[in-house]
């Protein structure tokens, strides 16, 4: 679909603007059962349900199906309120003051709304602009193929090897490394497992094929190869065994190459002299030609970043093997030659590819199911330090995880095609089927100011901004729909530094890269818990100011087990003069997610529907009984009810905090 065709789609979708009423459907009803069923399905593979929102890495994304359900309950025309009906919010203005992964913006623009999005962090803003902009997929393909060809000319020679069977030139897919550890007066190499691959028939490929003596000799040095289990048994797993005096990537020794021969197909091999020569050549070239400014890549203090510093890593570029640094540097150089309109999405694609192309990547190809060989950097929402590290070939031509080409096909091509014809899942006759929502698109047109929204649909106004002070007129927004920070989720902002330093290099003039991350509504420590309520209170006050009356509503999802989190949230809403109109509960997290497995975790979100406080005096909420037993659904439901009751009471901050503590004492 080119620009002309897209303009025709916008024209075809023009309908009379939605006529909002004094009462809002979500005040009284929400299809919890239907929303819960879809959210549970989506939680297993969110990126497949909403591919156009997953251009770049972000954390703690909320369910797209849940937010579609929320927005559908704002539709005044009952004939368009069904989940599978197109549109319904034409011309309505939706604000998200903390856009994060961009879920609200995408879901609202599909329904015909005009959207405003702010975030203090530049990455959500850049991603929203790139994923909502209507550049045709075919045009992006032309730009990408040209970029890829030029990149291959520059770096392809560093990712070649030879077939161990016929000696033909072959594409290197990835290289596996073992971690150097100190064992008394000598060094050993520690790997996660000696097994390289388990085939479907039960046979195994192991390192013993290539190192039958259990030792590797490389560049005049010899190491014994042991597993992490053996290392643990021998006590080679404490700080004394760490080798921190050498650069991070030099703590790893290459063991095995995986490649592809056009005749003999996939293979493993140990490194031969030519492979070693190629590695050394890349190391020399990178050392001579790549000079990233240290001040732009210095690792800041932070709960997760400190894990890097404790391993004597102080600059983000130290986390990349020489070939990976060449990939980044040459990509940066080529970026300066592509048309400006394509620089944003291409830079985001390169940035997100680094999660699959860093020395922190691990190996998971041992599993016979093999859902991709690469364990990406943030697979556990933290910095993990693998024993078996995997250096990927970003230009490997075959379909495999982590390559730039595969990411382009999934996050640009597939996402762009989906955006032109969004697909939902529907439960029919005891099975899920895919259904295209006719006359919807997940694309918009960027506005330069709020005045551009007049008599328009699917306009977006997105900018990096501290939402404690929003550049919007009073009574200018119909609904605020958002997902606030998780009280103490400082690790997400901290982990994002891994990408920010590179995006700042690729896009130096497109954001304020010097913003103060500590201005966000996150409690960095127990001593600073009140900051969450203070900052959020200022944001909620601004939301109250910009909301139209009488239909304006503030709606967001939230869950937390900590009574102080609920107390601070309630205090913020109280100061901003909001009352709770209704609360609903819907499934949120995948119960087998590695991030919540085996934890006393909440698997549901409370959907909170609030209205600006008015003259009405009638009280709506009854005080619930204290929670004694932990059950995710009941817990979230009760927390919503308690918030409603507290907001109607005249309680001091101290009494409010104590009420929550007593309520959640179980």
Name what the model sees in each region.
Residues 98:
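Conserved glycine-centered beta->alpha loop in an early N-terminal alpha/beta scaffold
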């Amino acid at each position: 679909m080119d620009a002309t065709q897209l303009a025709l789609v916008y024209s075809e979708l023009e309908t009379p603007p939605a006529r909002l009423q004094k009462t809002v459907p979500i005040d009284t009803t929400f299809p919890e059962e239907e929303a819960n069923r879809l959210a549970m399905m989506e939680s297993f593979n969110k990126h497949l349900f909403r591919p156009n929102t997953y251009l770049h890495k972000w954390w703690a994304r909320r369910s797209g199906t849940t937010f579609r359900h929320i927005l559908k309950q704002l539709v005044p025309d009952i004939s368009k309120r069904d989940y599978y009906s197109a549109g319904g919010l034409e011309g309505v203005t939706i604000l998200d003051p903390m856009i994060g992964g961009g879920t609200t913006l995408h879901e609202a623009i599909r329904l015909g709304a005009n959207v405003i999005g702010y975030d203090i962090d530049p990455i959500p803003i850049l991603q929203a602009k790139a994923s909502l902009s209507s550049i045709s997929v075919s045009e992006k393909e032309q730009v990408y193929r040209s970029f890829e060809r030029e990149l291959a000319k520059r770096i392809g020679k560093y990712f070649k090897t030879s077939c161990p069977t016929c000696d033909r030139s072959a594409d290197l897919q990835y290289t596996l490394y073992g971690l150097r550890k100190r064992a008394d007066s000598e060094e050993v190499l520690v790997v996660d497992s000696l097994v390289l691959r388990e085939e479907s028939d039960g046979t195994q490929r192991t390192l013993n094929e290539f190192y039958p003596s259990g030792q590797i000799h490389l560049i005049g040095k010899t190491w014994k190869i042991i597993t992490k289990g053996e290392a643990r048994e021998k006590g080679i797993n404490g700080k004394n065994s760490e080798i921190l005096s050498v650069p991070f990537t030099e703590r790893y020794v290459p063991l095995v190459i995986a490649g592809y021969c056009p005749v003999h197909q996939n293979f493993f091999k140990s490194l031969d002299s030519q492979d070693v020569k190629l590695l050394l050549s890349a190391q020399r070239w990178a050392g001579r030609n790549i000079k990233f400014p240290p001040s732009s890549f210095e690792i800041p203090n932070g709960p997760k970043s400190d894990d890097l510093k404790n391993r004597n890593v102080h600059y983000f570029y130290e986390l990349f093997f020489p070939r990976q640094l060449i990939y980044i540097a040459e990509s940066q150089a080529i970026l300066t030659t592509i048309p400006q309109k394509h620089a944003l999405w291409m830079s985001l694609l390169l940035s997100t590819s680094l999660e699959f192309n860093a020395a922190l990547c691990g190996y998971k190809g041992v599993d016979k199911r093999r859902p991709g060989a690469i364990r990406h950097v943030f697979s556990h929402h933290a910095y993990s330090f693998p024993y078996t590290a995997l250096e990927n070939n970003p230009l490997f031509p075959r379909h495999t995880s982590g390559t730039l080409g595969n990411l382009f096909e999934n996050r640009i091509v597939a996402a762009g095609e989906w955006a032109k014809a969004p697909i939902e899942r529907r439960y029919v006759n005891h099975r899920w089927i895919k259904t295209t929502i006719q006359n919807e698109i997940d694309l918009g047109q960027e506005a330069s100011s709020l005045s551009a929204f007049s008599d328009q649909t699917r306009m977006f106004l997105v900018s990096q901004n501290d939402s404690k002070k929003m550049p919007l007129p009073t009574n200018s927004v119909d609904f605020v729909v958002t997902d606030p920070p998780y009280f103490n989720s400082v690790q997400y902002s901290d982990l994002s530094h891994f990408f920010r330093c590179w995006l700042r290099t690729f896009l130096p003039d497109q954001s304020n890269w010097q913003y103060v991350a500590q201005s966000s509504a996150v409690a960095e420590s127990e001593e600073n818990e009140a900051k969450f309520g203070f900052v959020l209170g200022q944001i909620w006050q601004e939301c109250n100011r910009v909301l139209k009356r009488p239909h304006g509503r503030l709606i967001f999802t939230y869950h937390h087990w900590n009574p102080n989190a609920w107390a601070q949230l309630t205090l913020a809403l109280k100061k901003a003069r909001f009352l709770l109109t209704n609360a609903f509960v819907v499934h949120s997290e995948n119960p087998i997610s590695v991030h919540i497995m085996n934890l006393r975790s909440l698997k549901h979100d409370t959907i909170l529907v609030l209205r600006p406080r008015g003259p009405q005096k009638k009280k709506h909420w009854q005080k619930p009984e204290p929670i004694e037993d932990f059950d995710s659904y009941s817990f979230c439901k009760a927390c919503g009810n308690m918030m409603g009751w507290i907001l109607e009471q005249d309680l001091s901050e101290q009494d409010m905090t104590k009420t929550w503590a007593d309520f959640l004492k179980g």
